[in-house]
Amino acid sequence: MVWRRVVRQLVTLACEECKRRNYHTRKNRRNTPDRLQLRKFCPWCRRHTAHRETR
């Protein structure tokens, strides 16, 4: 079951506006090779903003 950990990678999501790293999630590198972008709530901006994967 070690190969499962290789496929799913732990990524950090940063707010597009304030650049703070608020969320951590896992993604499948085979299905999503490009950067992940989700709309999440930013506690510092106090609103929903786009959060993008950082490397």
UniProtKB/Swiss-Prot annotation:
GO terms for molecular function: structural constituent of ribosome. The keyword ATP-binding does not apply. One of its GO terms (cellular component) is cytoplasm. Keywords: Ribonucleoprotein, Ribosomal protein. One of its GO terms (biological process) is translation. The keyword Ribosomal protein applies. NCBIfam families: PRK00504.1, PRK00595.1, rpmG_bact. PANTHER family: 50S RIBOSOMAL PROTEIN L33, CHLOROPLASTIC, LARGE RIBOSOMAL SUBUNIT PROTEIN BL33C. Belongs to the bacterial ribosomal protein bL33 family. This is Large ribosomal subunit protein bL33. It comes from Rubrobacter xylanophilus (strain DSM 9941 / JCM 11954 / NBRC 16129 / PRD-1). The lineage of its organism: Bacteria, Bacillati, Actinomycetota, Rubrobacteria, Rubrobacterales.
